[in-house]
Amino acid sequence: MLETNFSALDWVIVGAYLVGTVIIGLWVNRYIKGMGEFLVAGRSLKTRLGIATMIGSELGLVTAMFAAQKGFSDGFAAFHIGLMAGIATIIVGLTGFIVVPLRRMGVMTIPEYYEKRFGSRNLRIFGGFILAVAGILNMGLFLKAGAIFVSGITGIDGEAVKWVMTAMIILVLIYTCLGGMISVIITDYVQFVVLSIGLLVTCVIAVQKIGWSTLVKGVDAIYSDQGFNPFIAESIGGSYVAWMFFIGVISCAVWQTAVMRACAAESVEVVKKMYIWSSLGFMIRFLIPQFIGICALVYFFDMGSTQPFFDGQGQVSNDSNVTMKAMPVFLGQLLPVGLLGIVAAGMIAAFMSTHDTYLLCWASVLTEDVFNPLKSYKMSDKQRILLTRTLLILIAAFLVMWGLWYPLGQDLWDYMAVSGAIYFTGAFAILMMGLYWEKASAAGAYSALIIGIFAVFGLRPVQEFFSLEEFFNKNEILGHHVGLTVSCFAIGGMIIMSVSFPNKEGNSEKI
């Protein structure tokens, strides 16, 4: 067992915080009068709270884990991810790219836009199904990341961690099922404040403990110039940087959880302000955890630590599960009792914040865009809320099972980017062409969605299943190469099929 400072006092702090979040869910349940309040908080989200909840849901434990893992694996070169995310978000905020037209249309989900724009209910159902499947797979390893964090920072064994994580997701289900988007927004705000303070204090203590010059020299000793320049790093390169910019646009303008907040905004002006100010948060949510990951790298390197983070030659471990554990183990050894509990509470609360947002998002997509359109009659608000709550429970059960057996095989961030690409490569083509090109048709949209599914070949286990691993390795084809290629083909397919099979006049809504 790895050494940690985690004590009984820290457990009390964490427990008290988690109980408080459940009380919030019970309290806001009285404000839920219909599906609009449950899914998009009655479209009453103002600028300041919108910024906090947008950053709060994205600044989760999973974000901290995969960002810290990238800092540990790539050094300061990993900072390009946050920089690309910040630039992409501010561009979306200034231009209103995609999100402003969606808010004007008054849609609650992206598949709902498919039907309004192209006049095809079947397209909405098909698109909603792909979105939900990709989204659920995308968050499939969130529980594993949470389990690794809890075991690393507290020192408890793996079997006990499984029960702790199961209890946590049950708490998430309770207040999300009761309060919907209103409880999500309120808890996101609280967790945003707690986690932000906790991470900043951690950075200060880490620099005081290690020293800035030691950090720079340590990264140089481990990675040389590759630890500072992403364009020459073997694991990164120019194509990966371009992929990160594209992911930055997707994260804020196409990914359903962010779009839900744009749709919940009070007005178009609020949407733009949310994105402009959130751009700093989208950047910092990567930079701070990456910096902590770099601190962990140098800390364990200077200690002369070998197992489990380094091999006998001083090389960083290539086991993704091991490198992901570096940050929580580092926190457990760095922070004093009490402060460690506060930071752990903030991190675990952030884990819950991400889960409540994503669970509600994918359950609502299945309800609004798959099951409800399949009905011969329109479901009542009461029926839709009941179905959404049922789906929340079923998705949570799947996540527990998936997180226990899926072999990671690559950095968590790369897994999330590729699994999300199953949806967003096609969706980006449909949104961009559909919103800004009048001739975009339903046939083109179908082709983009179908082509986008091929992004699944960026996942290692899929390559192994189809015996393609040797081909990908021999040709040095990585997940981001697959994602960029599929995105280009999806846009091309959208254009070709739209020109070849145009929509009939009058079967779509004007943008």
Where are the regions a protein language model picked out?
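Membrane-embedded helix-loop-helix hairpins and adjacent transmembrane boundary segments
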Residues: M1-I511
